[in-house]
């Protein structure tokens, strides 16, 4: 499932004729983003945030140490 789809060329969904690109009906409407409601006071959210912050701090420290 993590494999990239190599069968479809990258420009397959783009209009090939430059005149078609300007037409309003030729461009597909972007899929609306799904709004996700996250409970910021939940213990699971706090635990995940602390884990992400810790990893980011370690990354920044390693980045700083390697550039010195």
Curated annotation (Swiss-Prot):
<dbReference type="InterPro" id="IPR052142">
    <property type="entry name" value="Calmodulin_Regulator_PCP4-like"/>
</dbReference>
<comment type="similarity">
    <text>Belongs to the PCP4 family.</text>
</comment>
<feature type="compositionally biased region" description="Basic and acidic residues">
    <location>
        <begin position="18"/>
        <end position="31"/>
    </location>
</feature>
<feature type="domain" description="IQ">
    <location>
        <begin position="45"/>
        <end position="68"/>
    </location>
</feature>
<feature type="compositionally biased region" description="Polar residues">
    <location>
        <begin position="1"/>
        <end position="16"/>
    </location>
</feature>
<feature type="region of interest" description="Disordered">
    <location>
        <begin position="1"/>
        <end position="42"/>
    </location>
</feature>
<keyword id="KW-0597">Phosphoprotein</keyword>
<feature type="modified residue" description="Phosphothreonine">
    <location>
        <position position="8"/>
    </location>
</feature>
<protein>
    <recommendedName>
        <fullName>Purkinje cell protein 4-like protein 1</fullName>
    </recommendedName>
</protein>
């Amino acid at each position: 499932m993590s494999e990239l789809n190599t069968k479809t060329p990258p420009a397959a969904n783009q209009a090939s004729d430059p005149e078609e690109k300007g037409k309003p009906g030729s461009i597909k409407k972007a899929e609306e983003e799904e709004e996700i409601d996250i409970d910021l006071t939940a213990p699971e959210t706090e635990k995940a945030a602390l884990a992400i912050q810790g990893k980011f701090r370690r990354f920044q420290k390693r980045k700083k140490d390697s550039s010195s």
